[in-house]
């Protein structure tokens, strides 16, 4: 049976998030999601009189490419993607995953090379298109959240089909508070962290770039972060599962990092000179995320 919520979500992404208009070229990027998701997005773009361009991806295929990746190979792929992105007005990505740790055995050196090669493509998308990215609910994600698949799907659509425009007043108030905040002090079990926001403006996010949404974000003054923070929720990064993450800061830099996989997290933090510094601090007005929020399933930027 067709789920009408898929059509609702597609229309929201097209009409509200990316505001597709007549003649807009829209890249629809689907990763491990059912074909009917791409079909719903195509129809929504056509309804808006846009021009859909579709790419379908499979994580197993991508993993194999990365494991055997060469610089020459990804120079070609990166150029191909960048050239196409320069032709686009809008970009919508829907990312599912049958196995959230599928890329866990891709060598870190290979992963870092691929990410570096693809960075100009991502920068073009972020800076020069109207874009929105989101996850697609899968059994793998439901398992991570400790929920049944149907219950997780209901949760997903509940938070993704919000009237995000109605959140703007509350988010505006939060933005004003963050704009005038000079220092943040976070305390909790295993956590005592301080940093400055002085002189840095917050940005309110109302369902335009990431779904689900409802946050205001800023960034700490680079060298102001001091103390320790411990995370009570698991996360997946580059296909590797991390839990019990603890970070210690001095003069803004992570000087010690431990987790269930301490070696892997430090390899990531050593991948470039900026990786040991915090790039974002955010507060959310999204109160509908309850215990399910333990699952780290928000989209990548």
Predicted regions and their residues:
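Active-site bordering "gate/hinge" segments
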Residues: 1-227
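Residues that form or flank phosphate/diphosphate-binding pockets in enzymes
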Residues: 36, 240, 297
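A short, sequence-level motif marking secondary-structure junctions
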Residues: 197-203, 261-262, 300-301
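Oxyanion-binding "anion nests"
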Residues: 215-257
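Positively charged, low-complexity/disordered segments
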Residues: 286, 290-301
């Amino acid at each position: 049976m067709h789920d009408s919520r898929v059509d609702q979500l597609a229309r929201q992404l097209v009409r509200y998030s990316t505001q597709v208009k007549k003649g807009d070229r829209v890249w629809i990027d689907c990763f491990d999601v059912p074909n009917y998701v791409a079909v719903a997005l195509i129809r929504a773009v056509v309804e808006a009189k846009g021009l859909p361009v579709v790419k379908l991806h499979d994580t197993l295929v991508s993993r194999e490419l990365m494991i055997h990746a060469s610089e020459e190979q990804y120079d070609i792929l990166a150029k191909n993607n960048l050239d196409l992105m320069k032709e686009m007005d809008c970009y919508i990505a829907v990312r599912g995953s049958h196995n959230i740790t599928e890329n866990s055995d891709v060598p870190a050196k290979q992963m870092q090379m691929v990410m570096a090669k693809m960075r100009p493509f991502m920068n073009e998308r972020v800076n020069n298109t109207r874009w929105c990215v989101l996850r697609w609910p899968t059994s793998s994600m439901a398992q991570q959240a400790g929920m049944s698949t149907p219950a997780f799907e209901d949760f997903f659509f509940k938070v993704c089909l919000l009237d995000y425009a109605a959140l703007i007043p509350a988010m505006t108030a939060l933005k004003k508070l963050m704009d005038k905040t000079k220092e943040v002090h976070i305390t909790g079990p295993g956590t005592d962290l301080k940093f400055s926001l002085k002189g840095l403006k917050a940005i309110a996010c109302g369902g335009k770039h990431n779904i689900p949404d409802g946050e205001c974000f800023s960034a700490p003054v680079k060298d102001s972060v001091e103390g320790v923070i411990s995370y009570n929720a698991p996360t997946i990064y580059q296909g590797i599962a991390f839990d019990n993450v603890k970070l210690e800061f001095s003069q803004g830099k992570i000087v010690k990092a431990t987790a269930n996989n301490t070696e892997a997290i430090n390899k990531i933090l050593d991948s470039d000179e900026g990786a040991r510094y915090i790039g974002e601090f955010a507060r959310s007005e999204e109160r509908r995320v309850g215990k399910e929020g333990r699952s780290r399933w928000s989209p990548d930027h």
